[in-house]
């Protein structure tokens, strides 16, 4: 069972309740705070499940449905459209954080986290994870971890217990390298990736990449 790490983080006991009120005690198979994904397991057979869709194929303007348990209103479904892909919010403060959210206007509130975002075919395209709101309740913007990221994380957690990922060992300038940004950074290059910092003894450092390089 896929959910968000922040849903089960620091929990002493986790119970999964089905729509028919059947309850199962869940075991944590693994967590990945950098993507806010967690994998649980319950001892049960024949449970219904969703098929993964390829989240890379999701199109802007596509209709989606968000399923969840907002404010303990079980089996709530809301509809919206995809308005952005690969959205970064800066909500995950981990140095290894990976944010590439699908943005939608489907209503998501506290209690929706870890729920499914599905396409019109009922296929999983994301895991509802966050909202952007001054009040803590839905104000028009919600965000989901794409299914392709969730699928990779879940596969690694099942096989290895942790997520396997490579690390280049560099920090990149987040803004697009325009002439104005290039002038601010003191470089003549106006395209590419500006290396803001290099981690000592990392893969990039060993390859000769230095702070201030443009790749």
Question: Where do the protein language model's features map onto the residues?
Answer:
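Serine-dependent protease modules
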Residues: 1-191, 196-201, 206-207
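Conserved catalytic motifs of ABC-family nucleotide-binding domains
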Residues: 212-215
